[in-house]
C-alpha cells in the first residue's frame, strides 16, 4: 500500500501539533506505524491522501451510524449554514432535538446540550455533586469518560492504548475523590460504598464498556448498580456517549431495561458534528444554572449546525426496521470474523452488543479491564496492519470498539470477513 503522502503530512504535523495529531489514538503508536491522513469519505468508505480506499469500521469513533456524508444530513447542514453557523442565543432547533432525546431515552426528563462527551460527563458529575452535597465519585477501571481531571483515573481507551492508566497534571487532591471499582464486579462496588458510606455523589459507568474493547455487562450487573444507588442515595450515571442511539434507539438502558438517574450522550446525536448532552430526572436537572445554582455554560452549546445534523440523524434512525437491519449486519460480520479466526486456529475472544463489536486477541473471556489487558497487543498490531493492506480500516488499538453502520453492504461485510480469514491464516 502506497502511503507516502500520509507519511509526509505526519512529519509536517509533528512540527506544529503535539504528537502530530489532535487526539492521541489517531497517532497509530500502539500499532507501530504512522497514521493515515484522510481526505474524504462516503457511505462505508474512507479515502486517504494517497488515494487508498478502505471499508471503515471506526466511523469517526462511533458517530457515523448512517455512514459518511448521508445526503439527507449533508443537505440539512448546507441549508442551516446559510442561516448562520452560531448565534450564542436560543434556537427552536435546540428544543426540537431536546424533545427527540427525551422521547428516546428512558431516563431523560430534561436535557442540556454541550459540545463534547467530555463536557457532558464533567458537567453531569458536577451536577450530581451539587444535588447530593457529596464529593466522591465512583467509576470503573477501563471505563473512559472523557479527559476531565476527575475521570482520568484508570481510564482505559486512549490511556490504556499507551499503557498509562493516569495522566500527569491531575492533582492528587482531586484524584483522591475518584474511587475505582472493577467492571462487572458488584462486590467491589459494595465494598467501596461501605467503606465510603455517605460520601459518594455518583456512580458513573459505561453500561456497555466500549473503551477497553467491547465488554458487555454481566447478567445482573446493571441491575445491581441500580439497587445499590437507590439504597444509598447515590446518583447513577450511564455514560452512553458511545452506546446511546447505537445499540438501540434508547441506548443500553432501553436494551437492558435498567434506568439510571442521569445519562450522558454525544457522538451520534451530533450527526458527525461536535456535540454532547447530559440529562436526567427533573429534580436533578432543575439545579442547573440558570434555574439552579450548579454552573455550566458553553459558547457553542446547542449550535444550530450540530442541532440540525442531530435532528436529521435521529429522524433517519427512527425509520421502521432500522435497528433490526443494523443488528443483522453486525451479527453477520462479527460472527464471520470470529469463525475466520477459529477456522485458522487463531485464538480470539469475540464480543458484540448491537453494532458495537470487538475481536480480543485472547484465548480467555474478557469481562473487565484486567482480563482485557492480558490481550496480545503485538498480535493485534500485526492483524491491524494486515487488514489495512486488505482495505479494511479498524481502530488502531486493541482497546477500542469496532462500529457497523447501516451503509455497510453485504458485499462490504463479506469482503471484510474474507480479508480477516486471509490475515488470520497469515498470522
Curated annotation (Swiss-Prot):
Protein name: Glutamate-1-semialdehyde 2,1-aminomutase
Matching InterPro entries: 4pyrrol_synth_GluAld_NH2Trfase (IPR004639), Aminotrans_3 (IPR005814), Aminotrans_3_PPA_site (IPR049704), PyrdxlP-dep_Trfase (IPR015424), PyrdxlP-dep_Trfase_major (IPR015421), PyrdxlP-dep_Trfase_small (IPR015422)
Disulfide bonds: none
Localization: Cytoplasm
HAMAP family (UniProt xref): HemL_aminotrans_3
Upper lineage: Bacteria, Pseudomonadati, Thermodesulfobacteriota, Desulfuromonadia, Geobacterales
Organism: Citrifermentans bemidjiense (strain ATCC BAA-1014 / DSM 16622 / JCM 12645 / Bem) (Geobacter bemidjiensis)
Top-level division of the source organism's lineage: Bacteria
GO terms, molecular function: glutamate-1-semialdehyde 2,1-aminomutase activity; pyridoxal phosphate binding; transaminase activity
Amino acid at each position: 500500500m502506497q502511503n507516502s503522502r500520509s507519511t509526509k503530512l505526519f512529519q509536517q504535523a509533528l512540527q506544529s501539533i503535539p504528537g502530530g495529531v489532535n487526539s492521541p489514538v489517531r497517532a497509530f503508536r500502539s500499532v507501530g506505524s504512522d497514521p493515515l491522513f484522510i481526505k474524504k469519505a462516503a457511505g462505508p468508505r474512507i479515502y486517504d491522501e494517497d488515494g487508498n480506499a478502505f471499508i471503515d469500521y471506526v466511523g469517526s469513533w462511533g458517530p457515523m451510524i448512517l455512514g459518511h456524508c448521508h445526503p439527507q444530513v449533508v443537505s440539512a447542514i448546507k441549508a442551516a449554514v446559510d442561516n448562520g453557523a452560531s448565534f450564542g442565543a436560543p434556537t427552536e432547533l435546540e428544543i426540537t432535538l431536546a424533545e427527540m432525546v427525551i422521547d428516546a431515552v428512558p431516563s431523560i426528563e430534561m436535557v442540556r446540550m454541550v459540545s463534547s462527551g467530555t463536557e457532558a460527563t464533567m458537567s453531569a458529575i458536577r451536577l450530581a455533586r451539587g444535588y447530593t452535597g457529596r464529593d466522591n465519585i465512583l467509576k470503573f477501571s477501563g471505563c473512559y469518560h472523557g479527559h476531565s481531571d476527575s475521570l482520568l483515573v484508570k481510564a482505559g481507551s486512549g490511556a490504556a492504548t499507551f499503557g498509562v492508566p493516569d495522566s500527569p497534571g491531575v492533582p492528587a487532591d482531586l484524584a483522591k475523590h475518584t474511587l475505582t471499582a472493577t467492571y462487572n464486579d458488584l462486590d467491589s462496588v459494595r465494598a467501596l460504598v461501605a467503606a465510603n458510606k455517605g460520601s459518594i455523589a455518583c456512580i458513573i459507568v459505561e453500561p456497555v464498556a466500549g473503551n477497553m474493547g467491547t465488554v458487555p455487562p454481566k447478567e445482573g450487573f446493571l441491575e445491581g448498580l441500580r439497587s445499590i444507588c437507590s439504597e444509598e442515595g447515590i446518583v447513577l450515571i450511564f455514560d452512553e456517549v458511545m452506546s446511546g442511539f447505537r445499540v438501540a434507539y434508547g441506548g443500553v438502558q432501553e436494551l437492558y431495561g435498567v434506568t439510571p438517574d442521569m445519562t450522558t450522550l454525544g457522538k451520534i446525536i451530533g450527526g458527525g458534528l461536535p456535540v454532547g448532552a447530559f440529562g436526567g430526572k427533573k429534580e436533578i436537572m432543575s439545579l442547573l444554572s440558570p434555574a439552579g445554582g450548579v454552573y455550566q455554560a458553553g459558547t457553542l452549546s446547542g449550535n444550530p449546525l450540530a442541532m440540525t445534523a442531530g435532528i436529521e440523524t435521529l429522524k433517519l434512525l427512527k425509520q421502521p426496521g432500522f435497528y433490526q437491519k443494523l443488528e443483522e449486519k453486525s451479527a453477520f460480520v462479527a460472527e464471520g470474523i470470529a469463525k475466520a479466526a477459529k477456522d485458522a486456529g487463531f485464538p480470539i475472544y469475540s464480543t458484540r452488543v448491537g453494532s458495537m463489536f470487538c475481536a480480543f486477541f485472547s484465548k480467555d473471556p474478557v469481562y473487565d479491564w484486567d482480563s482485557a489487558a492480558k490481550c496480545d497487543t503485538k498480535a493485534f498490531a500485526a492483524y491491524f496492519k494486515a487488514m489495512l493492506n486488505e482495505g479494511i480500516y479498524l481502530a488502531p488499538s486493541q482497546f477500542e470498539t469496532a462500529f457497523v453502520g447501516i451503509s455497510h453492504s453485504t458485499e462490504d461485510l463479506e469482503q471484510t470477513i474474507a480479508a480477516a480469514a486471509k490475515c488470520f491464516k497469515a498470522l
